[in-house]
């Protein structure tokens, strides 16, 4: 692909990440997505009618209405002629949406694409099949957040057990995990206090009877986290295990996205892009150790870009669990000092369908801030997969 046909990031933005039943407790995912879409267009100076399509990842769509991506698009002010659709590759959805947007443009099917992800874990539904009725007795409800977002369909257990499996395979101790989690919290706290997330975040206004509330700060980050507090927690998924609530990612709400076009289109419009997408890849692994997915996915993405691990200046590797994040660091052998320099999902949170686009945002803005040349974003994916994307400064 020539430089002029390279796919670039014309703009990127995200909402703050909300805590479970926190600031965004009553806000549907599509409303979060709509705010991000409007901000993407505003930052790039692109008119709503100039967007060819909107592609948004979202995992938890039960009872959210038809096609939440279309709802986000229309609510953002895009014309009805602009199509929109959603995808579900679990935790990789937001980054996969960006990859598909890249492909749409590279294939000549679009000029301008909005891609990213949105998720409200707080509004995920409880449900059950009642078409045939219940003749007598109690009937158990299913938590769709757990069933559709956090449960391994092949082995019949929680994602936390897959993290326990990874910890055993890679010999990652409880101490290793707690130390990693504390570092994530400390880095995120420092980044938030220094204002390093401000360029990423678009403020979201929540209207209330007592006035408006502006949400423009990540809500989940724990200031003053201590190792002593973490070590007191009991294992969350296996009584003899090592994975706890403190060394696992959060349950969160949020949205994030990117506006994509070719470099030539950006030049024509007078837009200075944030970065160029160099390559992307996905890979499958055993579902029981799904957290290792970023290892083969990152290797494939690097190979497609013609890069080596040593070429990377920055990495955003999603922290589903400290155990799997440590395993990915070991498996790829990269310098941990360049990974998640502003903290990761353990501290910031993990709104599953949006997280891929969230870490993509954090990567491109931190690359710009540091003057970094080459970066990589990667996530593990429930069901046994990984996705990765290589990004290059222009």
Walk through the language-model features, giving the residues of each.
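Conserved active-site "lid/cap" helical segment
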Residues: 2-64, 68-76, 80-83, 162-174, ...
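Conserved catalytic cysteine-centered active-site region
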Residues: 58-111, 154-158, 224-250, 331-358, ...
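Glycine- and Gly-Pro-enriched alpha-helical subdomains that act as flexible
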Residues: 263-311, 329
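Flexible glycine-/small-residue-enriched beta->alpha junction loops
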Residues: 112-165
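Beta-strand segments within the central parallel beta-sheet cores of soluble alpha/beta enzyme folds
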Residues: 49-57, 83-88, 113-118, 176-183, ...
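N-terminal extracellular/periplasmic Venus flytrap/periplasmic-binding protein-like
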Residues: 8, 13-15, 25-35, 43, ...
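Active-site-proximal alpha-helical scaffold in enzymes
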Residues: 89-119, 167-196, 257-264, 329, ...
């Amino acid at each position: 692909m020539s430089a002029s046909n390279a796919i670039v990031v014309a703009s990127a933005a995200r909402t703050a990440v909300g805590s479970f039943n926190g600031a965004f407790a009553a806000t549907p995912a599509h409303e979060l997505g709509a705010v991000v879409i409007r901000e993407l267009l505003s930052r790039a100076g692109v008119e709503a009618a100039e967007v060819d399509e909107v592609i948004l990842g979202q995992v938890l769509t039960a009872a959210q209405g038809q096609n939440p991506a279309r709802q986000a698009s229309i609510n953002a002010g895009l014309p009805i002629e602009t199509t929109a659709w959603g995808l579900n590759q679990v935790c990789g959805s937001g980054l996969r949406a960006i990859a598909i947007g890249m492909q749409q443009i590279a294939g000549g099917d679009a000029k301008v694409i909005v891609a990213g992800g949105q998720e409200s874990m707080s509004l995920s539904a409880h449900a059950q099949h009642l078409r045939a009725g219940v003749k007598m007795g109690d009937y158990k409800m299913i938590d769709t957040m757990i069933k559709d977002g956090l449960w391994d369909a092949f082995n019949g257990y929680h994602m936390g057990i897959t993290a326990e499996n990874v910890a055993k395979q890679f010999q990652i101790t409880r101490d290793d995990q707690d130390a990693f989690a504390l570092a994530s919290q400390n880095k995120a706290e420092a980044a938030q206090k220094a204002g390093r997330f401000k360029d990423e975040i678009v403020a979201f206004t929540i209207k209330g009877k007592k006035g408006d509330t502006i949400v423009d700060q990540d809500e989940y980050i724990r200031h003053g986290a201590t190792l002593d507090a973490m070590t007191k927690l009991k294992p969350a998924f296996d009584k003899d295990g090592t994975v706890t609530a403190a060394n696992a990612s959060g349950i969160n709400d949020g949205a994030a996205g990117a506006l994509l076009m070719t470099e030539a289109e950006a030049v024509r419009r007078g837009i200075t892009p944030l970065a160029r997408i160099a390559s992307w890849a996905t890979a499958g692994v055993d579902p029981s150790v799904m957290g290792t997915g970023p290892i083969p996915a990152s290797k494939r993405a690097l190979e497609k870009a013609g890069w080596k691990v040593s070429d990377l200046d920055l990495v955003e590797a999603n922290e589903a669990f400290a155990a799997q994040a440590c395993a990915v660091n070991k498996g790829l052998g990269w310098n941990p000092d360049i990974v998640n320099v502003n903290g990761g999902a353990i501290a910031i949170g993990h709104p599953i369908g949006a997280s891929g686009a969230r870490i993509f945002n954090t990567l491109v803005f931190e690359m710009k801030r540091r003057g970094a040349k080459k970066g990589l974003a990667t996530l593990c994916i429930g069901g046994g997969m990984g996705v990765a994307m290589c990004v290059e400064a222009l």
